[in-house]
A protein has these predicted regions:
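Active-site-proximal N-terminal segment of extracellular/periplasmic enzymes that hydrolyze or transfer
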Residues: 21-65
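Metal-dependent active-site segment of extracytoplasmic phospho-/sulfohydrolases and closely related
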Residues: 33-34, 211-251, 291
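Bacterial Sec-dependent N-terminal signal peptides
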Residues: 1-25
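Active-site segment of extracytoplasmic enzymes that catalyze sulfate/phosphate-ester chemistry
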Residues: 59-102
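Substrate-binding rim/cap in mid-to-C-terminal beta-strand-loop elements of soluble/periplasmic
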Residues: 81-88, 252-295, 313
Length: 314
């Protein structure tokens, strides 16, 4: 009798393992990239009726994927906290100067631990040097463990602000290498910098330039046989900017007004339906949970939820 019970339990366990493996084979995605366009207001991007500042993202690319029209930053609306929410799946008040590490582990650490890959399999490439804090955590069980590679700032050393064209050149170099990163976040800063400089014309020009960068990034993915039909691209923001009439308007951000909280998300990839617009609210913490699901690693510290419309296999 005990033998029969043992065999029954063994069969049940094997069936569960087989089902889990079958679920894992469903996703075509093997590479995941996140492009963060730093600090545009929704009213100048997808919310602009004629799409004149982002003609590619708002039109042709939007039709190639699933667009979240009511995507939010529901935490502190600053650069480091916003990026931290994306990669950890948690909101926290953290220094925006890059002088403190996030409190929770991130997608890169969970991914590297789960896969056993070396640090170059996961990357943060950022125009803002302070974003090199994204790959580490102050969590005592994870601090300095499974730390991804970084190239942040003008010389990749985590100091200062670099030019977006240099950041994109580094991104291009990595994508065209023999072994592209499997998981990567890219930050482009110009929109945010010119907003803070109160330079409206340059702010708008930078939105258009990042539109071109986004299109070029997707094009490079499609032209690379290793990445084509195996890569999901998330295009999003870390925060918006004050609405007109709120404090200093587009010049700054950091409050909980709709302008600061309303950001965008466009998901492109082989597992994602085309031409779908999601109007229900989702938030930036959902990105981490979704990436964990499609790349098959556990991320228990993330507070996000799976973006099911973009990945309807589950």
């Amino acid at each position: 009798m005990e033998r029969i019970i043992f065999l029954a339990l063994l069969c049940l366990s094997l069936n569960k393992q087989a089902n889990a493996q079958n679920l894992q084979t469903n996703y075509k995605t093997k590479y995941v990239y996140i492009l963060v366009i730093d600090g545009p207001r929704y009213s100048e991007t997808y919310g602009e009726p004629t799409c004149k500042y982002s003609p590619i993202l708002c039109d042709s690319l939007k039709h190639e994927g699933t667009f979240y029209a009511n995507f939010k930053n529901n935490g502190p609306t600053y650069t480091v906290p916003g990026h931290t929410a994306i990669v950890t799946g948690t909101y926290q008040r953290i220094s925006n100067a890059g002088t403190a590490l996030p409190k929770e582990p991130n997608i890169f650490q969970y991914f590297l631990k789960a896969t056993g890959k070396d640090s170059t399999a996961a990357y943060v490439v950022a125009s803002k040097g302070k974003l090199d804090v994204l790959v580490n955590t102050s969590h005592k069980k994870w601090n300095n463990q499974f730390v991804a590679s970084t190239y942040c700032g003008p010389n990749g050393n985590g100091l200062g602000y670099g030019r977006d064209d240099k950041t994109f050149a580094k991104t291009t170099e990595l994508l065209q290498s023999a072994n592209p990163p499997q998981l990567m976040l890219i930050n482009l800063l110009a929109v945010d910098v010119y907003g803070h400089a109160n330079n409206w014309d340059k702010y708008l020009e930078s939105i258009t330039q990042t539109d071109l960068y986004a299109a070029k990034l997707w094009q490079m993915i499609q032209e690379n046989p290793a990445l084509r039909n195996q890569t999901t691209l998330f295009i999003t923001n870390d925060h918006g900017r004050h609405l007109d009439g709120v404090r200093s308007g587009f010049v700054n951000h950091g409050c909980r007004c709709e302008g600061c909280r309303h950001i965008s998300l466009l998901v492109l990839g082989p597992d994602t339906p085309k031409g779908v617009v999601v109007t229900e609210e989702s938030e930036m913490t959902d990105i981490s949970k979704t990436i964990a699901d499609i790349l098959h690693f556990e991320m228990p510290t993330s507070k996000g939820e799976l973006l099911r419309t973009a990945f309807p296999l589950k």
